């Protein structure tokens, strides 16, 4: 599901709220979550999961085109850990 698909689905379920208001709310929520993570803070949504930053240590990588070794700096990357309720709901899914 993309961001625009999420907005469309929420707008169709909440017909009393203008689609533009739903779009603005979703964009504002995502922007607030991104800025919270950028400040190094953890986000926890009970029953859904938590977002945090994990540190990746410096390492030697490879350029996929040339195969040459490349030194990669350490960096922080976003990490999502699903909550128990989300894990349980996703576990029922069968292809």
From Swiss-Prot:
GO cellular component: chromosome; cytosol
CDD domains reported in the protein's UniProt record: IHF_B (cd13836)
A biological-process GO annotation: regulation of DNA-templated transcription
Pfam family, one: Bac_DNA_binding
Keyword hit for Nucleotidyltransferase: no
SMART domains according to UniProt: BHL
Complexes and interactors: Heterodimer of an alpha and a beta chain.
HAMAP family assigned: IHF_beta
Stated role: This protein is one of the two subunits of integration host factor, a specific DNA-binding protein that functions in genetic recombination as well as in transcriptional and translational control.
The protein's name in its UniProt record: Integration host factor subunit beta
Species name: Klebsiella pneumoniae (strain 342)
Upper taxonomic lineage: Bacteria, Pseudomonadati, Pseudomonadota, Gammaproteobacteria, Enterobacterales
């Amino acid at each position: 599901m993309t961001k625009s698909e999420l907005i469309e689905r929420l707008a169709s379920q909440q017909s009393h709220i203008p689609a533009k208001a739903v779009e603005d709310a979703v964009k504002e929520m995502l922007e607030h979550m991104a800025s919270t993570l950028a400040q190094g803070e953890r986000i926890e949504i009970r029953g859904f999961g938590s977002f945090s930053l994990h540190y990746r240590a410096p390492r030697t990588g490879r350029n996929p085109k040339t195969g040459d070794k490349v030194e990669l700096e350490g960096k922080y990357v976003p990490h999502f850990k699903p909550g128990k309720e989300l894990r349980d709901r996703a576990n029922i899914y069968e292809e």
